[in-house]
């Protein structure tokens, strides 16, 4: 039975596959070897033949066996009466019954109120990003797919920067990730300097960047690091410069970097002359932000700004990695404009050792074209986007797409680049029934009232509960499902279904990885299988053509790359994309040289931002809730700046909290406090701390550190207590440590993007307990289980401290 992707050893079959999700993970596509005996996973290890990860794995993949066989996992369809929402009164049902309930509700609501009154939610960074717009457009015919994070504050703003300034794709540091022989490829030149701005890729491996590659290049080639972060991260301890910027002031610092490069003439005039537009206007604009002024705003020494910017400007080549700091701020678009400019004006954009560009994803083009779409634009189904298929087959009309999608009339910038609603406006719609009343929601690997993405989650809770019908596609019970849903459709994990993972969702593809099905657990089905089953009952004229998920994937997912059998056998197929694609006509759909923008150049002066009513050049604007913007009367009440969103390796946002080995690493939510601030407030390591803002208060345990900027606290996001009572009002302790309780909605930039996640005012004080029982009794599990499920305890707190083996921030290295 030996094939390229599986082999037999003794009594085991060993499968090679690439990880994505579920459980949650970014599309980094780490290589797995999954050992299976008698239909059950016995061991998971890294795949040494994977050209990027080379056998290494994060704790989440190593704990995948615990995850898929956890006794709390949902492995059968479940239903519950609407009047029992909020209570644990679920009953097992058949797949046919469950999909009938979903499809019949959708058809009835569409007939009575219109398909637009149905919404489909999706989570962040997961494979479900592929599916929830397809659920919306192709299964239900609604334009309203929802990513519920206030201000669409993850990846979308960066996509907008690249779309508006460069025409698309996604810029990423060069670590030879596209070449089969990696660092040995003669085209590759290692970066001399990497500028890490608001990013800790060792923990997050974000969106396709394999973070450990930075360590490889530091060790092999002497690559140097500049970190911009209010916290000294593990990479920060090894950086040449760590600029501990005050959260919310990054744009001022980035403008000062451009000022230094222009002042010292550390720019590539040939590239600027041939391939950029608006350089002179940009230089004129940054004259208002010399390093002396930026130092006062950012809390970074002026001489360090000069030194770090010169280090970046003198490096040949240099590369930029930008993180969530670009997205989760109301001034984030302007920060992104500056960082794209820093990539470009040094001349190392899509150059060896610089910042690579992707050739883009053709499904993104239809969204960027905005109002030019019609149902007759294309005739070949096999090359159509999700939206084009929905229009062509009469599942959705152009009028519905352009006039019924919530929030894009107020924020057309969001509607131009993305395929979803504007989330803050959608929440208002739920609350006010304006412009129309919503009646149904589906949650595809999404937990909007939970602890990961939804600001003011109590508002989402109250609004979603009142809908006529709700369903979820997920693996575990969570607060949203318990509070709001009527049907659960159990979805397969990454090693339980066939599929494909592409770095950066295809916007900058390093490789195409096969997700090869290794095992079957219970009655779980893949996202695609579930879509097909429901779709055949809502729009059979379109969906009946697909016998299985392979047929659909070959038709609509793999068509741009490789046939499934070839993708599966390769396991990893490197993209092998060249450098300097803009010189060879590989970025523009017309095949001409240059960039797919109005000018054919990198637009440092952005016509697209200008079109949508935003300044075409970057500018600094203080945070909406910050030390300089709050009223004097509030300054004593909220003397700290709160930032959140940093990753821990053992969790993905709100997932994995019930997995014993992962919970043991970080058993409690943690708030990072500077040691001087802690001493002044009488806070010691491990104390319970209450964090409050004008919007609410929650509790987390203190980590007292020298490595976080004084006056700044960082709070862990995504924490809940699945070992606690699930029924309302507790909802698994959803409200106790949920830092999103402190964040407002509708604090957006002119574009509709950004929020306060990276910069919010707060106060902290020592308290004596979490609140409620700190050590609840172990959940008694009395569920019917197949023999494959071994007896296993749900995690519960233990006495005494637990050592965190990956507590990098506590390790300081002196240079």
Predicted regions and their residues:
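Catalytic alpha/large subunits of respiratory electron-transfer oxidoreductases
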Residues: 1-496, 583-585, 590-594, 598-600
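Long, low-complexity segments enriched in small/aliphatic residues
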Residues: 368-375, 382-384, 395, 401-412, ...
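Extended, charge-rich low-complexity interaction segments
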Residues: 177-182, 187-190, 381-404, 496-524, ...
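C-terminal substrate/ligand-recognition segments
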Residues: 430-431, 435-441, 445-450, 462, ...
């Amino acid at each position: 039975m030996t094939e390229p992707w599986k082999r037999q050893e003794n009594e085991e079959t060993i499968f090679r596959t690439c990880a994505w999700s579920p459980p949650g993970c970014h599309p980094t596509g780490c290589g797995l070897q999954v050992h299976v005996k008698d239909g059950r996973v016995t061991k998971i290890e890294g795949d040494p033949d994977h050209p990027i990860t080379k056998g290494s794995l994060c704790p989440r993949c190593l704990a995948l066996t615990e995850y898929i066989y956890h006794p709390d996992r949902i492995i059968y369809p479940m239903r519950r009466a609407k009047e029992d929402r909020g209570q644990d009164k679920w009953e097992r049902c058949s797949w046919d019954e469950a999909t009938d309930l979903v499809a019949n509700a959708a058809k009835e609501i569409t007939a009575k109120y219109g398909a637009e009154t149905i919404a489909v939610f999706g989570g962040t960074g997961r494979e479900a990003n592929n599916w929830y717009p397809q659920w919306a457009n192709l299964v239900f015919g609604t334009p309203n797919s929802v990513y519920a994070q206030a201000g669409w504050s993850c990846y979308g703003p960066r996509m907008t920067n690249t779309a508006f300034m460069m025409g698309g794709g996604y810029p990423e540091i060069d670590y030879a990730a596209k070449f089969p022989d990696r660092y040995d490829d003669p085209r590759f030149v290692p970066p001399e300097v990497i500028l890490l701005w608001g990013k800790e890729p060792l923990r997050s491996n974000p969106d396709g960047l394999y973070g450990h590659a930075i360590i490889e290049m530091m060790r092999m080639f002497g690559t140097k690091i500049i970190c911009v972060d209010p916290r000294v991260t593990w990479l920060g301890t090894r950086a040449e410069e760590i600029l501990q910027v005050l959260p919310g002031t990054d744009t001022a610092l980035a403008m000062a970097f451009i000022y230094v490069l222009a002042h010292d003439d550390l720019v590539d005039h040939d590239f600027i002359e041939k391939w950029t537009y608006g350089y002179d206007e940009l230089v004129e604009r940054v004259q208002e932000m010399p390093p002396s002024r930026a130092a006062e705003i950012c809390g970074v020494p002026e001489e360090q700004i000069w030194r770090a910017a010169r280090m970046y400007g003198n490096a040949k080549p240099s590369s930029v990695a930008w993180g969530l700091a670009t997205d989760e701020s109301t001034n984030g678009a302007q920060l992104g404009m500056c960082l794209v400019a820093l990539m470009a004006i040094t001349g190392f954009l899509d150059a060896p050792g610089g910042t690579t560009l992707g050739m883009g994803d053709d499904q993104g083009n239809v969204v960027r074209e905005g109002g030019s779409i019609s149902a007759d634009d294309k005739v070949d189904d096999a090359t159509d986007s999700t939206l084009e298929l929905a229009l062509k087959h009469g599942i959705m009309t152009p009028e519905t797409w352009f006039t019924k999608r919530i929030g894009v009339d107020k924020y057309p910038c969001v509607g131009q680049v993305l395929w979803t609603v504007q989330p803050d406006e959608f929440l208002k719609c739920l609350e006010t029934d304006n412009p129309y009343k919503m009646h149904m929601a589906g949650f595809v690997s999404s937990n909007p009232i939970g602890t990961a993405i939804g600001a003011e989650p109590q508002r989402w809770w109250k609004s979603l509960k009142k809908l006529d019908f709700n369903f979820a596609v997920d693996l575990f019970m969570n607060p949203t499902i318990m509070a709001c849903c009527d049907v659960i459709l159990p979805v397969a994990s990454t090693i339980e279904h066939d599929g494909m993972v592409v770095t950066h969702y295809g916007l900058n593809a390093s490789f195409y990885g096969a997700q090869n099905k290794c095992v079957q657990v219970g009655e779980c089905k893949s996202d695609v299988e579930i879509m097909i089953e429901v779709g055949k009952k809502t729009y059979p004229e379109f969906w009946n053509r697909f016998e299985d998920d392979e047929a659909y994937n070959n038709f609509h997912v793999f068509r741009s790359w490789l046939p499934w059998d070839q993708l599966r056998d390769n396991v990893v197929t490197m993209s092998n994309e060249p450098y300097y694609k803009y010189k060879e006509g590989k970025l523009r759909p017309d095949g001409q040289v240059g960039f797919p923008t109005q000018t054919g150049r990198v637009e440092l002066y952005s016509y697209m931002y200008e079109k949508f009513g935003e300044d075409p050049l970057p500018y600094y604007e203080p945070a909406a809730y910050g030390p300089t913007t709050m009223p004097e009367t509030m300054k004593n009440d909220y003397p700290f700046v709160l930032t959140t969103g940093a990753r821990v390796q053992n969790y993905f946002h709100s997932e994995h909290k019930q997995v014993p080995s992962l919970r043991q690493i970080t058993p409690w939510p943690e708030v990072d406090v500077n040691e001087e601030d802690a001493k002044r407030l009488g806070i010691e390591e491990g104390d319970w701390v209450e964090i409050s803002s004008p919007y609410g208060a929650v509790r987390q345990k203190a980590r007292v550190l020298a490595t976080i900027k004084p006056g700044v606290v960082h709070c862990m996001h995504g924490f809940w207590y699945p070992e606690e009572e699930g029924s309302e009002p507790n909802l698994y302790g959803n409200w106790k440590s949920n830092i999103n309780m402190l964040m407002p909605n509708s604090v957006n930039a002119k574009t509709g993007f950004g929020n306060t996640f990276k910069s919010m005012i707060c106060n902290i004080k020592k308290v004596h307990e979490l609140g409620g029982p700190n050590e609840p009794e172990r959940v008694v599990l009395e569920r019917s289980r197949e023999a494959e499920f071994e007896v296993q305890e749900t995690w519960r707190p233990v006495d005494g401290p637990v050592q965190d083996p990956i507590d990098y921030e506590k390790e300081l290295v002196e240079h």
